[in-house]
Amino acid sequence: APHSSQVVSFDPKTTATLHVNSPKLWWPNGYGPQNLYTLHLSFEIDGKSSDSKDVSFGIRKFSYSVSDSENLTISVNGVRVFIRGGNWGLDEAMKRNPRERLEAQIRMHQIANLNMIRNWVGQSTSEDFYELCDKYGLLVWDEFFQPNPADGPDPDDFDTYMANVREKILRFRNHASIVLWCARNEGYPPKKIDDALRVLMAELEPTRLYQANSADGRGVNSHGPYHWRTPREFYTFNEAFKTEIGSVSVPTLESIHGMMPEKDWETINDDWAEHDFAKGASGGDSYPAMIAARYGRVLNLADFVRKSQLANYEAFRAMYEGRNAKLFHPTTGIITWMSNPAQPSFVWQIYHHDLEPNSALFAVKKAAEMVHIQLNESTGDVEVINNLAVPLSARAHLAIYNLDGSAVYQRDYDVSAATSAATSLGVVDWPAGLSAVHFVKLELKNAEGKLVSENFYWRALPGHQDDLRALDGLATVTLDAKVARRDVPGKSYIDVMLHNSGTQVALMTHLQLRRKRDDERVLPVYYSDNYISLVPNESRTITIEAGPADLMGDALVLVDGWNVAVAASSSRGVELELNVDAQVEHWPVTGLPMTSSSK
């Protein structure tokens, strides 16, 4: 009838096109491909199309419990999934976030080997967000619109609230990536709302989990910490499913220069506080002193960034590796606070608001590998983490280097790693004669001899674990480098081949892609790895992916690091040279003072 609506249902018993024979399954990132299907719906009047809609969906099966644990354990298609995620609030503070930018944000989560995004308080609301999570294999912990009870009141209008919840579920439930619905951040909803939500879930979403509280129930826990902690401290947390844990995460020097005026670069003041570097949950007021005590006196902003990239890497790697060590016993998930920054910030991010990743992204990428080798920084065990659905036979190699770069100990291990488990290869037998600060390099090769995981640590002797100041005295290593560019339709790939022909370790080698024509950074851009360390006589290749239109001609790769220099190199369409601005000695010594108002 005119001015009316009607619900039309299609039943697979009577609609043959709803049957999918031998479906290709949708998997979260790392566990398999993200196979998606399209359902075409149309409404016709007298044989002519009046309206149509294409609906994307994936075929997968979720379950939320296992026989050997009471903790929330998510399985997809019968395979237990260790949740490695990031929290999102607003995707962008002003909600100015076109699909192209959003895709870069979500793709960087995929590159970091994450498999979940928590849509904190439901603040990401676009169809693009869900479509891209489907595409890149990011499970969505989705939430309704109730903040922590301390941060916001209960809904005033019950009927309007429930209508909004119903609309949200109906609008987005076709997306393969949504794995559960959560009612409230860090608190329970009022009983009337909780009861109504449970009824609504039974009606509209009987196969997805309803979680009433993001911080309680079946091993789920929130409440941080949110400030920088030493790596070994991250091994002490025993919560099974951690929905919030974070750290200071300082961006690159260029990102800092871009987010505040030059007058504020060399003084930690209120402008820094405006970008979240202040007292409070992030611990920004105590961070500079901690950095100096751990790594040595901070000379200026460039030195602060240099030391902070080391701190970023240590904290974010340990945040995930500490959970790896307890894989499914009891740990079933970790979601860092936060992975995506809504505004330019010094904290809680794995890339900056301008989309340049800092060392935190590559630390997470390392720790969140499906097959991973690690040094337990609490017990001293070498551990192999196997997230695969099949057992692993492999060979591991351990090498220890003194601060001067000399190799002082090596050992090989035969590895038999069970599926979905952490396997200890034993405590390292630390040799005599170690320097006060030394390095540990780990490698894991599969049965065919292919390298599947490697890891690198800087470490101090017991009793002085937090004194790494000797690193500040490392001699400069000049790396040999070659670059090559490959252009294909829509993409350019730049391969950077680095070789350490010296006798010292080259620590935290960092690449940054720029346009040659104007020396501006190319953002976003995707690195196969970054902030890498090379022992003497080691070679590594990093591949950079960019769009030819973003390069607008020739490319320029800049190199910096903890103690890294580089010989200039070039080939067709690309040049490589030292990032002079990132060098500590390029800038005056200021000590980076902190004003009283910012403490």
Task: Please identify what each model-predicted range represents.
Residues K48-P149, D157-L180, A278-R306, L310, ...:
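Active-site-adjacent substrate/metal-binding segments within catalytic domains
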Residues S42-E44, D128, L132-Y136, R171, ...:
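Alpha-helical structural signal in soluble globular domains
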Residues A1-M116, L327, T331, E356, ...:
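Secreted/periplasmic carbohydrate-active enzymes, especially glycoside hydrolases
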Residues F82-G85, M116-N119, L139-D142, V179-A183, ...:
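Structural recognition of the beta-strand scaffold that forms the well-ordered cores
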Residues P149-P155, C182-A183, R411-D412, G426:
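Short beta-alpha connecting loops at secondary-structure transitions
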Residues D51, R166-D270:
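Active-site region of glycoside hydrolase catalytic domains
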Residues S65, L90-D91, S124-S126, N148-A150, ...:
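Flexible loop/turn segments at secondary-structure boundaries
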Residues W181, E233-A399, V408-Q410:
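Substrate-binding clefts and catalytic carboxylate motifs of secreted carbohydrate-active enzymes
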